[in-house]
């Protein structure tokens, strides 16, 4: 009987990508098959996120639930990876001594040998080092699971925003070689992928070296990926305003495969708070970039990230954030109450804003962002949208679902499963809070 792998992933798209590569790696080297039940597993992997405090607490809660499984089956291997593992290293075993393997985002390629070593030696295996980007040299070709796929183009971040742990958990920015990324995209396209999302913590800072020694930026990469036969839609995330270049704006205007949607985190609408965050740009500079983009690509959808309650945030600072929201007109966006991350400069700042006030501000901000996002959805009613059909509807097996360019789920009646993995034109009939309803055009 084949041995089983259970994997749970917390956090961002980069973690989702890493988890998929771990599945590929362990499938090839140890013939592990994925199971949906942790209690059936021979190996349990937890790929963690440390962006927010509650995410970190969630790690230890989950490990605590698996303790009984380990006691019942001592041969089971429990491995913890991702950013919490990178940040805490061997200290994870202080709170969860039954964990066998601890590895970081840059050492996931060592998983097979670490698991084997844990079994043979009965000793914990810990490697949270930063061997730059060598992990990609040890990973098998990615398996294809549906018409959409993530492709990691770079690792780490060198911006060192004062609130963020990424430079400490994933290391400095390192771009994958241009031709390696292209080879992965070609492989995916040859196996039925129609849409790729190019990933990086600061993806528009991509600087990949080509086979002839030239340095290519993200705009160069997008143009070449768009020319790959079978790739009809390109997304990328996450971007930093500082490196949202004119060449990237030009690519948005000239490359039809690049979606009319941009996720560009701003975090705050207060220049004072942006400076304290070490974002190194102003709200005026942010809006200037977006004005230039919208002039080049009318109707493009803009989403963002917001942090509410950063240390020292005043009522005026928050009002400036709300003003920025009105000035820009965002699509559905992500927003959170600030939580201090150990080891970051912001964790040492005085935070005298009451938690109740932070939550009140967050509720007001989310309410307005949701209003703006729903208004964009409402304006789409009556339009014809080209969607990539991805799966059956989650609520009705007689319906299929797909995504628009601006990342909205569309559910529509259809009895032809062969449409999954293809593009289709759908008339938008109705806007709902978290999705759209449509009718397939024949």
UniProtKB/Swiss-Prot annotation:
Q: Where is the TRAM domain?
A: 378-442
Per UniProt, subcellular location reads as:
Cytoplasm
- Is Phosphoprotein a UniProt keyword of this protein? no
GO MF annotations, alphabetized: 4 iron, 4 sulfur cluster binding; metal ion binding; N6-isopentenyladenosine methylthiotransferase activity
**Segments forming domain Radical SAM core:** 143-375
What coarse category fits the chief subcellular location reported for this protein? cytoplasm
- Residue numbers binding [4Fe-4S] cluster 2: 157, 161, 164
What does it catalyze? N(6)-dimethylallyladenosine(37) in tRNA + (sulfur carrier)-SH + AH2 + 2 S-adenosyl-L-methionine = 2-methylsulfanyl-N(6)-dimethylallyladenosine(37) in tRNA + (sulfur carrier)-H + 5'-deoxyadenosine + L-methionine + A + S-adenosyl-L-homocysteine + 2 H(+)
User: What region holds the MTTase N-terminal domain?
Assistant: 3-120
Binding note for cofactor: Binds 2 [4Fe-4S] clusters. One cluster is coordinated with 3 cysteines and an exchangeable S-adenosyl-L-methionine.
Which EC numbers characterise this protein's activity in its record? 2.8.4.3
Going by the record, the broad EC class of this enzyme is transferase
Superkingdom of origin = Bacteria
Q: Which UniProt keywords apply?
A: 4Fe-4S, Cytoplasm, Iron, Iron-sulfur, Metal-binding, S-adenosyl-L-methionine, Transferase, tRNA processing
Give binding positions for [4Fe-4S] cluster 1.
12, 49, 83
Q: How does it assemble?
A: Monomer.
Q: Its family?
A: Belongs to the methylthiotransferase family. MiaB subfamily.
Q: What does this protein do?
A: Catalyzes the methylthiolation of N6-(dimethylallyl)adenosine (i(6)A), leading to the formation of 2-methylthio-N6-(dimethylallyl)adenosine (ms(2)i(6)A) at position 37 in tRNAs that read codons beginning with uridine.
Listed NCBIfam families:
miaB-methiolase (TIGR01574), MiaB/RimO family radical SAM methylthiotransferase (TIGR00089)
Query: Can you say what this protein is called?
Result: tRNA-2-methylthio-N(6)-dimethylallyladenosine synthase
The organism that produces this protein has a lineage beginning with: Bacteria, Pseudomonadati, Pseudomonadota, Gammaproteobacteria, Pseudomonadales
């Amino acid at each position: 009987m084949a041995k089983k792998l259970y994997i749970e992933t917390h956090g961002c798209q980069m973690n989702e990508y890493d988890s998929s590569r771990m599945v590929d790696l362990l499938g090839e080297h140890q013939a592990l098959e994925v199971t949906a039940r942790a209690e059936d597993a021979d190996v349990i992997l937890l790929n963690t996120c440390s962006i927010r405090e509650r995410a970190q607490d969630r790690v230890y809660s989950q490990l605590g639930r698996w303790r009984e499984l380990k006691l019942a089956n001592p041969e089971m291997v429990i491995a913890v990876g991702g950013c919490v593992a990178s940040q805490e290293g061997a200290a994870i075993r202080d709170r969860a001594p039954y964990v066998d393997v601890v590895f970081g985002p840059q050492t996931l390629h060592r998983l097979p040998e670490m698991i084997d070593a844990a079994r043979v030696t009965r000793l914990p295996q810990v490697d949270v080092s930063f061997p730059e980007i060598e992990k990609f040299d040890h990973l098998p070709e990615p398996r294809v699971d549906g018409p959409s796929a993530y492709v990691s183009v770079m690792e780490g971040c060198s911006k060192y925003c004062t609130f963020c742990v990424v430079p400490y958990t994933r290391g400095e920015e390192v771009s994958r070689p241009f031709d390696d990324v292209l080879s992965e995209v070609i492989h995916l396209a040859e196996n039925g992928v129609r849409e790729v999302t190019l990933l990086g913590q600061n993806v528009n800072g991509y600087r990949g070296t080509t086979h002839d020694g030239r340095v290519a930026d993200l705009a160069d990469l997008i143009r070449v990926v768009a020319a790959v036969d079978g790739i009809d839609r390109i997304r990328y995330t996450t971007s930093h305003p500082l490196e949202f270049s004119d060449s990237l704006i030009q690519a948005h205007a000239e490359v039809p495969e690049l979606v009319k949607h941009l996720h560009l985190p701003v975090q705050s609408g207060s220049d004072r708070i942006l400076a304290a965050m070490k974002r190194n740009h102003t709200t005026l500079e942010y809006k200037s970039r977006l004005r230039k983009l919208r002039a080049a690509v009318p109707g493009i959808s803009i989403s963002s990230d917001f942090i509410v309650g950063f240390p020292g945030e005043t009522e005026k600072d928050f009002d400036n954030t709300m003003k920025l929201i009105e000035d820009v007109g965002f699509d559905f966006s992500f927003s959170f109450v600030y939580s201090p991350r150990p080891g970051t400069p912001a964790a040492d700042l005085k935070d005298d804003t009451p938690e109740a006030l932070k939550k009140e501000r967050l509720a007001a901000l989310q309410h307005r962002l949701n209003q703006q996002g729903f208004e964009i959805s409402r304006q789409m009613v009556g339009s014809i949208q080209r969607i990539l059909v991805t799966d059956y509807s989650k609520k009705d097996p007689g319906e299929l679902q797909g995504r628009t360019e601006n990342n909205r789920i569309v559910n529509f009646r259809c009895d032809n499963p062969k449409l999954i993995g293809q593009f289709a034109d759908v008339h938008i009939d109705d806007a709902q809070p978290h999705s759209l309803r449509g009718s397939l055009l024949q």
